[in-house]
Amino acid sequence: TFILFTAMSPEAGGLGFDAMQNGWVFAFIGLMGVIIQGGLIGKLTDMFEMNKLMILGTITCGLGIASIPYVPSEMSWLILLSSAFISIGHGLFSPTQSSLLTFESSRKGHELGVVMGAQEGYGALARIFGPLLAGYLWSLTVEGSGFWTYHTCFRVAGLIFIVAALLQLNLIKNSELSKTITRVE
C-alpha cells in the first residue's frame, strides 16, 4: 500500500511518485537499515536494555507507517521522515527481538532452532497476511470519504503496532516475573 499511496495522483491525495522516485525512497530505507543494523545497534544495546529498544522500535515503526498518508504532496520529501521512522524502528526491533528470543529460549532450555524457526515462520505469515489485509482495506476505502478513506489501512497498521507493543510489554513483564520466581525458588 506504500507504493499505492506514493504513486496515487496528488489530486487524489497521494504523492504522484513515479517508479524512480519510489526507488529512491526504498534506497533511503535500505541505507537507514544498514546504518542502524550495521553500525548503531551494537552501541545502542550496550547503552540501553534490549527489551526497551525492541518496544521503542515497534512504536517508532508504527508511527512511521501510520504517518504515511498524512504526507502532503506539496511537501512530498516528508515521506523520507516517515520512511526513516519505519526503517529505524525495524532496525531496532528486529535484531533485539531475535536476541531476546535467543536468550529466553536458552534460559528455558528450549531448542534454539525450533524457536528461531517459529520466529521466521510467524514473520513469513505476517509478510503474507499483512499486505493482503492492507490491500483489501485499501480496495475498500480508497474511494471512500470521511473516516473510511485510503488512510484506513495505515491507521489499522498503526493500531496493530500498538497492540504489538502492548503484547511485548506484557511478555517482558511476565518474563521478569518468571525470573523473580526462579530466583526465589
Model-inferred region functions:
Residues 11-32:
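Loop-to-transmembrane helix entry
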Residues 18-20, 136-161:
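A membrane-interface helix-boundary motif in multi-pass transporters
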Residues 35-50, 138:
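Helix-to-loop junctions at the C-terminal end of transmembrane segments
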Residues 59-73:
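C-terminal ends and interior cores of transmembrane alpha-helices
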Residues 68, 155-185:
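Multi-pass alpha-helical transporter architecture, strongest
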Residues 76-93:
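Hydrophobic core of transmembrane alpha-helices in multi-pass small-molecule transporters
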Residues 92-108:
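Intracellular juxtamembrane helix-capping segments at the cytosolic ends
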Residues 109-142:
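A late C-terminal transmembrane helix in Major Facilitator Superfamily
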